[in-house]
Amino acid sequence: MRIAAIQSTPVILDAEATVEKACGLIGDAARDGAQLAVLPEAFIPLYPSNAWAKGAAAFSGWDDLWERLWENSVDVPGPITERLAEACREHGIHCAIGVNERESERPGCL
């Protein structure tokens, strides 16, 4: 099995643009002969690594950041997972992709 380990950055806090990017990367991997495309952890919409950085507590924009993170996170299953699945079907490939998943039973929870 040929596996494409894709190192790429998301379009920060923009799920729609990141899904388009991911679908393109999936297609590229398939054209290069991969049967499995593996994309980064929390690729949609981003991995909020700075939340644990030194001095992060002094950042005044956390409320806006967390709201945008939730708004751009993924319902599983949902429209975003369907678009990714369609890209995989179209190109005859499988993918593993990390997402921030919204919890539908508890709004505001990831």
Task: Cite the ranges covered by each PLM segment.
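Active-site beta-strand/loop signature of hydrolases that rely on acidic residues for catalysis
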Residues: 18, 26-55, 65, 88, ...
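Active-site catalytic microenvironments in core metabolic enzymes, especially phosphate/sugar-handling
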Residues: 60
